[in-house]
Amino acid sequence: MAGHSKWANIKHRKAAQDAQRGKIFTKLIRELVTAAKIGGGDVSANPRLRSAVDKALSNNMTRDTINRAIERGVGGGDDTNMETKIYEGYGPGGTAVMVECLSDNANRTISQVRPSFTKCGGNLGTEGSVGYLFSKKGLILIASGDEDALTEAAIEAGADDIQPQEDGSFEIYTAWEDLGSVRDGIEAAGFKIQEAEVTMIPSTTVELDAETAPKLLDLINRLEDCDDVQNVYHNGEISDEVAALL
């Protein structure tokens, strides 16, 4: 919501408060275990695992905890029967919302997700109801750097697009399959990666007013409080003027 960053509007994130740390760690460990189970324990050869490790480190998870989770995934422990499920629905103001879940019990998950939509004036849709509005992309965030040099490095590495932000940061978009190789190329050119992960980018956005924006944020918060929810994506656009009123 700050500036005109698409990322800030696409994916709302709550601060990792101490009270939330246990739940955040649980979700991160689930993703580490699942990524290692599906793609193996070699971070350099498993982009999903690399992204999960980076996210875990950014949330101050220790290397020992990360390594134990990876070992569980590779070893096929009891908690590796998780499956990824995407739920689609409509939020306040007609916004499109996609909810990425990781769960071993679909009935439990839907019983958490559906009421979140209902309580916030939205409704859970059927598969494909809003998915066509989003594209799966790789996103790399760079906090600062020389724009010309970064653009050259990103293009050379195979990036699709680079977008400078008002705060001096940069958003670099890639084909999701190329995220790892583009990241490596940019790092090799001397730039520090702030974050890199696969995300969902909307093709169109819905601008929200001061009445509707808080309702969407409430929906996102409710969904992110669900244990099985890993990520929430939406196409709501919140202007600086509206954000200042929240």
UniProtKB/Swiss-Prot annotation:
Disulphide bonds annotated for this chain are: none
**Superkingdom of the organism of origin:** Bacteria
Gene Ontology molecular function: DNA binding
Provide the primary localization. Answer: cytoplasm
Q: What Gene3D superfamilies does the record point to? A: 1.10.10.200, 3.30.70.980
Q: Where in the cell is it found?
A: Cytoplasm
Protein's GO biological process: regulation of DNA-templated transcription
Q: Which NCBIfam families match?
A: PRK00110.1, PRK12378.1, YebC/PmpR family DNA-binding transcriptional regulator
* Similarity remark: Belongs to the TACO1 family.
Q: What protein name is recorded for this chain?
A: Probable transcriptional regulatory protein APL_1151
* Species this protein is from: Actinobacillus pleuropneumoniae serotype 5b (strain L20)
